[in-house]
Amino acid sequence: MQALPNNLQETGAPDFVLFSSPGGNDALLGLPFNEAIDNINSIIDVLQNANPDITIIIELMAPGHSNMMTPELTTYFEQLQQGILSICEEQTSSNSSVVAVDMYTGFSDVYLADDVHYNVTGADFIAQRYYTLLATLLE
């Protein structure tokens, strides 16, 4: 997060951002839920300040492997899903859209190479979800 403003200055602000697994590392590190939401909002704020007309596609994150999804982590993920939907509503403006893409529904252990990273089949699943949404947004 700290390097993001400088990186945007060096590279220029994008028109589209695919925001993958927002809050995922925060959840795995055991950070408080509100801190994860604040971190996601801060990243979006930096992106929108760099380009007020930006479109941000943010994931409703796929779950980790069922072996690691404790009841506490499952609750955290479910809270993130709702929090991200709220962020989309709150951060969308007349110029900038923040749109959720559902990676959670239909995702299963067969899509994972380890506890949290996609295998080739999982990458295809994720890519198809992005493609479907991007095709609609770019029409």
Where are these regions (language model features)?
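N-terminal hydrophobic signal/anchor transmembrane helix of membrane proteins
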Residues: 1-13, 91-117
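Oxyanion-hole/transition-state-stabilizing segment in secreted/luminal serine hydrolases
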Residues: 1-37, 61-66
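Generic structural signal for well-ordered alpha-helices
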Residues: 5, 40-45, 81, 85
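N-terminal cationic-hydrophobic initiation segments that often serve targeting/anchoring roles
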Residues: 8-9, 44-49, 88-92
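Structural recognition of the beta-strand scaffold that forms the well-ordered cores
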Residues: 15-22, 26-28, 54-60, 97-102, ...
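Second-shell loop/turn segments in exported
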Residues: 25-33, 70-71, 112-118
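Substrate-gating cap/lid alpha-helix
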Residues: 54, 61-101, 116, 120-124
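Histidine-centered active-site loop/cap adjacent to the catalytic His
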Residues: 114-139
